[in-house]
From Swiss-Prot:
Protein name, as recorded: ATP synthase gamma chain
Keyword line: ATP synthesis, Cell membrane, CF(1), Hydrogen ion transport, Ion transport, Membrane, Transport
Keyword Ion transport appears in the UniProt entry: yes
Role description: Produces ATP from ADP in the presence of a proton gradient across the membrane. The gamma chain is believed to be important in regulating ATPase activity and the flow of protons through the CF(0) complex.
Subunit structure: F-type ATPases have 2 components, CF(1) - the catalytic core - and CF(0) - the membrane proton channel. CF(1) has five subunits: alpha(3), beta(3), gamma(1), delta(1), epsilon(1). CF(0) has three main subunits: a, b and c.
Gene3D superfamilies: 3.40.1380.10, ATP synthase, gamma subunit, helix hairpin domain
InterPro entries given in the database record: ATP_synth_F1_ATPase_gsu, ATP_synth_F1_gsu, ATP_synth_F1_gsu_CS
Membrane topology per record: Peripheral membrane protein
Family listed: Belongs to the ATPase gamma chain family.
Annotated localization: Cell membrane
Disulfide bonds: none
SUPFAM superfamilies cross-referenced by the UniProt entry: ATP synthase (F1-ATPase), gamma subunit (SSF52943)
Any one Gene Ontology BP term: proton motive force-driven plasma membrane ATP synthesis
Organism: Bacillus licheniformis (strain ATCC 14580 / DSM 13 / JCM 2505 / CCUG 7422 / NBRC 12200 / NCIMB 9375 / NCTC 10341 / NRRL NRS-1264 / Gibson 46)
Amino acid sequence: MASLRDIKSRIASNKKMSQITKAQEMVSASKLNRAENKAKSFVPYMEKMQEVVADIAVGYTGKHPMMSSRPVKRTGYLVITADRGLAGAFNANVLRKAYQRIQERHQSKDEYAVIAVGRMGRDFFKKRGIPVISEMTGIRDEVTFSEIKDLANSTVQMYIDETFDELYLFYNHFVSAISQEVTEKKLLPLTDIAPNKKKTSFEFEPDEEEILEVLLPQYAESLIFGALLDSKASEHAARMTAMRNATDNAKEIIADLELSYNRARQASITQEITEIVGGAAALE
């Protein structure tokens, strides 16, 4: 049985830990509010851009490389994770799904490559010997498009240059503060752009082909940025939940330890009384 001093030390340690996890929960809650608003505010922009691209694409008869399927010799995987843990299964879930897809689809490392966003994903793939052709870490919580523009641009350019022939995106989609869904999306080629059912009449200058030449890369880059915003909101939600659970667990442990402490203290006092009574009886 642990001594009173040991139990008291464990109680103090768990109280300090619960204070830390509670503070982290509050920080994550604050960050979640901002990240969620930013992710939601980006949706109308994406919807309008998709509407324009779809309306052009539905009548486009050319063969833009970003809209045309070609024989797949190599597949790219853009995987978005966090730079740190303490977020429950946030990183593990998306990495597990991406790794599973790679194992299912490919026999050789020459058939695929990973673009890793986030330190957790980069370290995961490198540890397993999976080729990482591009990486980005240290992304701020208040991420802006200018921060990830080079990565998004180079990713799209690698597809255009046929470094890979298709690109899949893996990230955590934000559903609510208590729910995030691992999402797999085929990003390139852009063959699944659904035209607007209520077709909007646009006049294009100079012509559709030149507009697509500029708009399609921007659209693909915006999809990447939108997924990153979504992932950031999911990360803060997952960390907030994980820290709340950790705080609750610490409180339960503290309650159990305090009960053990009181029982041990009571047993110690009883033992002392018994010894005093026994000693007094021996003197009579």
